[in-house]
Amino acid sequence: MDTIILGIESSCDDTSAAVIKNGVLLSNVVSSQAVHEAYGGVVPELASRAHQQNIVPVVHEALKRAGVTKEQLSAVAFTRGPGLMGSLLVGVSFAKGFARSLNIPMIDVNHLQAHVLAHFIKESEEDNNQPKFPFLCLLVSGGNSQIILVKAYNDMEVLGQTIDDAAGEAIDKCSKVMGLGYPGGPIIDKLARQGNPKAFTFSKPHIPDYNYSFSGLKTSFLYSLRDWLKEDPDFIEHHKNDLAASLEATIVDILMDKLRKAAKNLKINEVAVAGGVSANNGLRNSFREHAGKYGWNIYIPKFSFTTDNAAMIAITGYYKYLDNDFCTIDKPAYSRVTI
């Protein structure tokens, strides 16, 4: 009998639904909210309202593209957290009600674990390029920077994480200081491709173990920029490519230094990257360089699976379904949680 999972994602500002059948992706629909760009960041109230407007048509479209009726579903998987509480509640409430109406199991999914398991999304039966357990995963996004030891689908251990700002958050804030707009990741990435990564030097933290810190880098960037602008009011315009490239290179160096140490100490050569920042060109290139230099088997997600999406929720739900790992209707959403 086929196992068909509907995944629902609504943790931040993307409303998404996806359908996976026996581990193979049939559809993945994402509705993004452009309204937040004018505010320089996600406005929780606006995000919640947009989710309410989008969730029904998005789910309908996901089922339609998959060629699946709701009666064929085996279970409904949904993001339970972490994320914005108002946004989460829309997806959680809809998923619970939908599953209850169909009398099928509901599966709660940790959003961070789902980013890691995005590497197991198969777009065809022949797609077998997945990491082998155990492997290391660098999870980098606007809210998280973690090194994770992945022992099995549902067995993960955080080896290190940021003690303050996440890498993506630092990029967004530096982009905002430069007047480049939001979200900063794609903008910095585009400019960095035309710049010199060694043009400017910014401070790197000395944090023990495998933990990260990006608040000092953010402050160093801000103060350096302030001093340069005193000498040349048009400094940003004259040097934005080099600034972006130097910022990106510094962040990538910080991320890869700890990941490299973890891989060496644990003697693991299966290494993956996940999360929104994994779309960054500089980080992807660094992974490829490390693969050649250190013999890593690397796993870099498709761009469509780097940002928030329901395909990763559905595949996580699929493996939880195989373990009979279901949740009850009284399980609440949670805004803060780790793996």
Curated annotation (Swiss-Prot):
Give one Pfam family, short name only.
Answer: TsaD
Please list the residues that bind substrate. L139, V140, S141, G142, G143, D172, G185, D189, N280
What is the recorded name of this protein? Answer: tRNA N6-adenosine threonylcarbamoyltransferase
Its Gene Ontology cellular component terms are:
cytoplasm
Q: Which gene encodes it?
A: tsaD
Q: Which GO terms describe its molecular function?
A: iron ion binding; N(6)-L-threonylcarbamoyladenine synthase activity
Any GO BP annotation: tRNA threonylcarbamoyladenosine modification
User: Which cofactor is recorded for it?
Assistant: Fe(2+)
